Structures are given as C-alpha cells and as structure tokens.
C-alpha cells in the first residue's frame, strides 16, 4: 500500500465514523474494528464519549488531510496512520486514524480526536 491508498481508505472510514459520532450509531462506529480490540467498548461508553465530544467540540463540520505517518509493525500487521484537521463548531482538532490489513480486509486499530 502507498500513502495515496492509505489516505483513501482512512478517509472513507473517517467519514463513516464521523457520521456515527453525529448520529449516535454504535454499530456504524465499530464495524471496522476487529472485536478483540473493542470487546470492552460498550454502547454506554460510546454514548458517553460522543456526548462529551459534542459538548467540547460541537458537531463535525469537515476535515482536511494533513499527513500519513510511518508506523512499525504491530502484532505482525503494518499500521498506516493518517492525521487530519477536524473542523468542529466550537474548535479545530487533530484526528489521528490508524488502519491495518488482515486477511484481505482493512480494519481500524485506532481513532482519536485531540
């Protein structure tokens, strides 16, 4: 995979997850994670996290690509991390998004808003 492919895939997943945040859709938010990495992440925690994020940031108004970062292997998987400028009603933020491929399927390993 090259940087352009990493950007394309993470942008698609970012769009899905922002929609999930804005609509409170837990299944949409978690669909790209392997269960082993989110087994303790509950609907209640998702709702609490998104409520706190909306109070701090407001609703999402868009994003802008900043960079692809190099990352070493994690448990035998090469991780592709992308960094985005998230634009929200109340402030701008940094969004870090990481994906890896396993059995021909791309998965999210991390998504964070700073």
Description of each model-found segment:
Residues 1-4, 45-49, 95:
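Short charge-dense sequence patches
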Residues 11-12, 27-77:
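Short solvent-exposed beta->alpha transition segments
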Residues 1-23:
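Short, low-complexity N-terminal intrinsically disordered segments enriched in polar/charged residues
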